[in-house]
Amino acid sequence: MKRSLLFSAVLCAASLTSVHAAQPITEPEFASDIVDRYADHIFYGSGATGMALVVIDGNQRVFRSYGETRPGNNVRPQLDSVVRIASLTKLMTSEMLVKLLDQGTVKLNDPLSKYAPPGARVPTYNGTPITLVNLATHTSALPREQPGGAAHRPVFVWPTREQRWKYLSTAKLKAAPGSQAAYSNLAFDLLADALANASGKPYTQLFEEQITRPLGMKDTTYTPSPDQCRRLMVAERGASPCNNTLAAIGSGGVYSTPGDMMRWMQQYLSSDFYQRSNQADRMQTLIYQRAQFTKVIGMDVPGKADALGLGWVYMAPKEGRPGIIQKTGGGGGFITYMAMIPQKNIGAFVVVTRSPLTRFKNMSDGINDLVTELSGNKPLVIPAS
């Protein structure tokens, strides 16, 4: 869309020759050329074993990969290489929340207790309940992880649904829900449980019906097949077995591929061929400003979190960089990052497998710089001499 509009502008300018002298116009670069300038630096700077990068800029889609799918195999990641998206799972859980909101199944301010299993207890703080919007914005006052997990366990297999609701029955909140932001994986697993209970369907069925099947995401799952496990990228450091990850159903358990994540990301971005989803504004709406919190914990990994949405984190414009809405992830030897400038129809998804040298910030800084340059990539009029 962006490139076709720019082309129209060039034609219009070229036709105005009777009154004014033609003004030379420099064409914008292809997105692929800009991506190529950054991708090498992102890969080598992150210290990754392997990397896959998907970028959408209006009508342009770019895929780049580096390194190996497994240490020593000399095979580059492909669009159908299986990856763990880790905490980007939370964006899909929030998407499910919006879909059920629009269907009238739940409300943002519904208390979690409304959708708890029979006989379960949900803690409050001086009578203030945990609501669904608290779970989706890291403002529930629940801990990042449920206490008591065994050391060195495989990722995304604990706590199970039964274990987390049992823990909740004795948990105590140390702050009022909504008063502070503190990153919580536990909260998103409880949110997925609540959405399943509200709908009367298993969450995996909802996930397929509402998200993966409509978008054609055939390799996005919690229960990978033998073929998908063979395609799973393996990190040099921190690799975990290819198990079902239903325990982390709302927080981090999703397996996917770069190709599927491109399909998922496209729903937020318009082009001549795709229309931004009519639910995208609600999925990316900002709920809280940072100034509303007494404390912010664990939200600033790729940059200062200026506002929180439903799973999404917003970084306000700063020092020439436009506002970016983003989400980070990591686990099982993978680190992931998605960054978007939706109003410019620009988005990037990157996944890397870890080595002992891997650094998240080098990766996220590179992606932030990449989408920033893409957003400023427009034709320039050079004044006639």
UniProtKB/Swiss-Prot annotation:
One of its GO terms (biological process) is peptidoglycan catabolic process. Disruption phenotype: Disruption is viable and exhibits no overt growth defects, but produces morphologically aberrant cells, particularly in cell filaments induced by aztreonam. Residues 1-21 form the signal peptide. Transmembrane segments: none annotated. Its EC number is 3.4.-.-. GO terms for cellular component: plasma membrane. GO terms for molecular function: carboxypeptidase activity; endopeptidase activity; penicillin binding. Keywords: Carboxypeptidase, Cell inner membrane, Cell membrane, Cell shape, Cell wall biogenesis/degradation, Hydrolase, Membrane, Protease, Signal. It is found in: Cell inner membrane. It holds the Pfam family Beta-lactamase. Its main location: membrane. PANTHER family: BETA-LACTAMASE-LIKE 1-RELATED, PENICILLIN-BINDING PROTEIN. Belongs to the beta-lactamase family. Hydrolyzes the cross-linked dimers tetrapentapeptide (D45) and tetratetrapeptide (D44). Removes the terminal D-alanine from muropeptides and disaccharide pentapeptide M5 with a C-terminal D-Ala-D-Ala dipeptide. Associated with recycling and remodeling of peptidoglycan (PG). Also displays a low beta-lactamase activity. This is D-alanyl-D-alanine-carboxypeptidase/endopeptidase AmpH. It comes from Escherichia coli (strain K12). The lineage of its organism: Bacteria, Pseudomonadati, Pseudomonadota, Gammaproteobacteria, Enterobacterales.
